[in-house]
Curated annotation (Swiss-Prot):
It is found in: Cell membrane; Cytoplasm. GO terms for biological process: intracellular protein transmembrane transport; protein import; protein targeting; protein transport by the Sec complex. ATP binds at Q85, G103, E104, G105, K106, T107, D492. PROSITE patterns: SECA (PS01312), SECA_MOTOR_DEAD (PS51196). It is a peripheral membrane protein. Part of the Sec protein translocase complex. Interacts with the SecYEG preprotein conducting channel. Has a central role in coupling the hydrolysis of ATP to the transfer of proteins into and across the cell membrane, serving as an ATP-driven molecular motor driving the stepwise translocation of polypeptide chains across the membrane. It comes from Geobacillus kaustophilus (strain HTA426). CDD domains: DEXDc_SecA, SF2_C_secA. Its EC number is 7.4.2.8. Disulfide bonds: none annotated. The gene is secA2. This is Protein translocase subunit SecA 2.
Length: 797
């Protein structure tokens, strides 16, 4: 163990030394670069691009290019990159995560690799935690890039397609990860290639990379549309499942938010609906409603995961505590919660396109990031994204003191201690920032502060811009502020006059988060750039963290607890126990993310095949459209003959009527009556069919295909692909829902899902061929002049 830790430490130290040497080389360029005029400095961009065109690489020019950006930032912003920022920029250029502490200037550091990679003209994406930060950084850092002759774009929601296209065409584009991901999905739903807004994904730098790639990775991006499936089942299901008991009718894992029906639970639903087997495919809609109702009642929590306001269920962002206007839970979960809460039930949505954040960002040719808290997830970053974490030293030695946790037996005892601490700090004018894990907890604590007569600010339900503005004042003398842990992230808290002498900003964490990294981020709000500061977590066994832990083990540990007169746990060691609980839950979340990634990777691979198929059709030239149509018809006919004339069945038993009907749909004028197909071998039937195919081929070759008809046929093909793909996606979703059942039969559930998904995908491709064939033939009927009587006679059954 110690050997491994020492090895990691040595590797990190070697990396830091290597980067420090490169930073020293950049410093050597400073006198030369600083002597240039503004115009000469701008001209460097042209020179660098010419050198790259002549075959030099980014590594060949990086030292000089970084020196140019540093000088431009000094002239435009009045900010000169510290050596540690140069090191962070170099780490990101190499495709790593630069772990830089809060207040160390990550945003400025990102200008260095962004500029360097933008010189290739492929587009650089800078991903921020929210739209406010995207706008802010685009405006502030964009001044440096524009000064150097590069273009800068902003990609946020509510923009038109043409505005987005312009933003993506820029050398450097700022935006949120979800918006980039949704644009990718929307691009694969367009009906003209020129309507796509994204270029091929080249290089992305992700700010707060752990929040975006890990904490938010459990929620897939989904574009959905109204399904037309009635919502009347949800209230009925709510009346059934509300009486269920854990361990009896259902089992759940609060750490991973998974829930399973027991045999007894399934039987209760079967009795209620008068069916034999809930898991039969004919009852898949019922099973879907049952599982979502279970999640609504026993996983999702009011005022934590969602709120009910004006008769509407509204999602709460788990990281900021902010209500997400206009968003709804997908796949029927929203409707199940509405039934639970007794409000009007909205229409359920069908999934039209989906991707996880993980798989979206893995499509970039090169990825990098920055955060103050990557080390605890070092292994996951490497396993999932092949990203190394490099810890960059601080510019000034840290003067923040992190006190040991105080752990109390009850919530009430914890709040009393928090109030005492705040009063003590407030008496000397020292500012205090109190971090909570949810809006509901913030409000509870605020009420307790008001009762205790403590003046304070409650940072809830604010816009991102207001949050940033208010949290920036948290370091002022006498300030007391309550906020969710992630509120106003990305905003520096500057100390007011005289606050350094009082000890700086003091942070109080009121609960340990499910992730140690978010606790680190809260602590990191104090003691920026060598300022004094301190932090302490004051928590209790009533906190949500312990609700997620094994309750039997928790009870066992509680039975040994000894407290002092204030209710603080003194024995057994509470800090060790808290670390154990947090690690267990973090591991469970890691497993859940791996679970999602394994399943989604199967769907992602299939998505890419379908998206490629769509693009192929949309890219067809006028002369190629009919050939593409014939390709689908040819495949459909081959599959039809094989399906109705199987080798392992006697020809007397073949479904000739079914075959004839299918061929009539494939050829709008199939020349042979049904009796011509009876009592024939497969080869003879195939010969008749392929003769007919050749006639169709010749007829299509004579067909005039103008631009309008070309466009219509392309649209028909793509509409058919989309319709079948949407059904397939929803089918895969149902398969995912029942995956836990496979493990009961000693099957590997992931392998089983992979095999089932593959079989469904083969069926999907066959359905697409059949659909394109039928739809196109129906459309083209009017284009042919045929002998109606002859056609009618041939097509009689």
């Amino acid at each position: 163990m110690f050997a491994k830790v020492k090895q990691l430490f040595d590797e990190s130290a070697r990396e830091v030394q290597r980067l420090a040497k490169l930073a020293a080389q950049i410093n050597e360029w400073e006198p030369t670069i600083s002597s240039l005029s503004d115009e000469q400095l701008r001209q460097k961009t042209v020179v660098f691009k010419e050198r790259l065109e002549r075959g030099e690489t980014l590594d060949d020019i990086k030292i000089e290019a970084f020196a140019v950006v540093r000088e431009a930032a000094r002239r435009v912003l009045g900010l000169r990159h510290y050596d540690v920022q140069l090191m962070g920029g170099l780490a990101m250029h190499e495709g790593n995560i630069a772990e830089m502490q809060t207040g160390e200037g990550k945003t400025l550091a990102a200008t260095l690799p962004s500029y360097l990679h933008a010189l290739l003209g492929k587009g650089v994406h800078i991903i921020t935690a929210n739209e406010y930060l995207a706008r802010r950084d685009c405006e502030q850092m964009g001044r440096v890039f524009r000064f150097l002759g590069l273009t800068v774009g902003l990609n946020v929601s509510q923009m038109t397609a043409s505005e987005k296209k312009e933003a993506y065409a820029a050398d450097i584009t700022y935006g949120t990860g979800t918006e980039f991901g949704f644009d990718y999905l929307r691009d694969n739903m367009v009906y003209r290639l020129e309507d796509k807004v994204q270029r091929p994904l080249y290089y992305a730098i992700i700010d707060e990379i752990d929040s975006i790639l890990i904490d938010e990775a459990r929620t897939p991006l989904i574009i959905a549309n109204k399904s037309g499936i009635g919502a009347e089942l949800f209230p009925i299901m709510a009346r059934i499942v509300r009486t269920f008991e854990e361990g009896k009718e259902y089992e759940r894992s609060l750490e991973t938010k998974q829930i399973f029906l027991t045999e007894e639970g399934a039987q209760k639903i079967e009795r209620a609906f008068g069916i034999d087997n809930l898991y039969d495919w004919e009852h898949h809609v019922l099973l879907h409603h049952a599982m979502q109702s279970l999640r609504a009642w026993f996983i999702m929590r009011r005022d934590v995961d969602y709120i009910v306001k004006n008769g509407k269920v509204m999602i709460v962002d788990p990281f900021t505590g902010r209500v997400m206007e206009g968003r709804s839970f997908s796949d029927g979960l929203h409707q199940a919660i509405e039934a639970k809460e007794g409000v009007e039930i909205t229409e359920e949505n069908d999934i039209q396109a989906t991707i996880t954040i993980q798989n979206y960002f893995r499509m970039y040719e090169k990825l990098a990031g920055m955060t103050g808290s990557a080390t605890p997830s070092k292994e996951e970053f490497w396993q999932t994204y092949r990203l190394r974490v490099i810890t960059i030293p601080t510019n000034q030695p840290s003067r923040r003191t992190d006190w040991d946790d105080l752990v109390y037996q009850t919530y009430e005892a914890k709040v009393r201690k928090i109030i005492d601490e705040v009063k003590k700090m407030n008496a000397i004018g020292r500012p205090v920032l109190i971090g909570t894990t949810s809006v509901a907890q913030s409000e509870q604590l605020s009420a307790a502060f008001s009762k205790a007569g403590i003046p304070h600010h409650l940072l809830n339900a604010k816009t991102e811009e207001e949050e940033a503005r208010i949290i920036a004042t948290a370091g002022q003398k006498g300030q007391v502020m309550i906020a969710t842990n992630m509120a106003g992230r990305g905003t520096d808290i500057l100390l007011g006059e005289g606050v350094k002498e009082l000890g700086g900003l003091h942070i109080i964490g009121t609960e340990r988060h499910e992730s140690h990294r978010i606790d680190m981020q809260l602590r990191g709000r104090a003691g920026r750039q060598g300022d004094p500061g301190s932090s302490q977590f004051i928590i209790s066994l009533d906190d949500d963290l312990f609700r997620l832990y094994d309750q039997d083990e928790l009870k066992k540990w509680k039975s040994k607890v000894e407290t002092d007169e204030t209710g603080r746990i003194v024995s057994p060691d509470p800090i060790k126990f808290v670390q154990k609980v947090q690690t267990t839950i973090e591991n469970a979340h890691y497993s859940a993310r791996l679970h999602l990634l394994k399943l989604d990777t199967v769907i992602d691979q299939q998505s890419k095949v379908i998206y490629h198929m769509r693009d192929r059709v949309l890219a067809l030239k006028q002369a190629e459209v009919l050939s593409e149509l014939l390709r689908h018809i040819h495949r459909h006919i081959t599959q039809t003959i094989d399906r109705y004339c199987p080798e392992n069945v006697f020809f007397e038993e073949w479904n000739i009527e079914g075959l004839h009907n299918e061929l009539r749909r494939a050829f709008f004028r199939f020349a042979y009556p049904i009796d011509d197909l009876r009592h024939k071998q497969k080869e003879e039937i195939a010969q008749l069919v392929w003769d007919e195919y050749k006639s169709l081929e010749a007829a299509l070759a004579d067909l005039p295909c103008d631009e309008e008809q070309t466009m219509r046929l392309k649209h028909l093909m793509v509409e058919t692909i989309d319709a079948h793909w949407i059904r397939h996606l929803n089918q895969l979703n149902l398969l995912k829902e029942g995956i836990h059942l496979r493990s009961y039969g000693q099957e590997d559930p992931y392998r089983a899902f992979e095999m089932d998904a593959y079989r469904e995908f083969v069926a999907l491709q066959q359905a697409i061929d059949a659909g394109i064939c039928t739809t196109a033939m129906n459309y083209l009927k009017s284009q042919f002049v045929i002998d109606d009587e002859a056609a009618a006679a041939a097509n009689k059954p």
